[in-house]
Amino acid sequence: MEKKFKLIYKDKEIKLVFNLNVMQAIQEEYGTIEKWGSLTDGESGEVDIKALKFGFTAMANEAIDIDNDDNGTDEPFFTTKKAGRIISDLGFDKVVMAINETVINSTKDDSEKNA
């Protein structure tokens, strides 16, 4: 379930991870993953910027935390302000697509295993 999606920002790789830790953070903030998803997918109107920044920050910080654990590094975590600057520079469409792909690719194997 821990598949990483990668974005390039200012010649640096940003990884996004959607796992149980990220799911828990989203549920604590938005109640359900489905509710958060409807706020960030843009299908029913304007993308909720706070929800987008929250999800992006949670996914990026989880990837940083995993890399820090795996590699013995101490890469700093993103703030929501930094996430906002990155999202603005990369563009909403690109980031929304990256978040959606991360969620879909991280969860599709689980449903196949349970079938």
Pin down the residues of each PLM region.
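Active-site-adjacent beta-strand anchor residues
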Residues: 16
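Charged interaction scaffolds used for protein-protein
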Residues: 1-8, 28-44, 68-115
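Residue-level signal for threonine
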Residues: 19
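Glycine-centered positions within short beta-strands or beta-hairpins
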Residues: 9-13
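Short active-site loop/helix that positions an aromatic residue
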Residues: 25
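Short, hydrophobic/amphipathic alpha-helical patches that form generic packing surfaces
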Residues: 51-62, 101
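Amphipathic alpha-helical interface surfaces
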Residues: 22, 48-56, 95
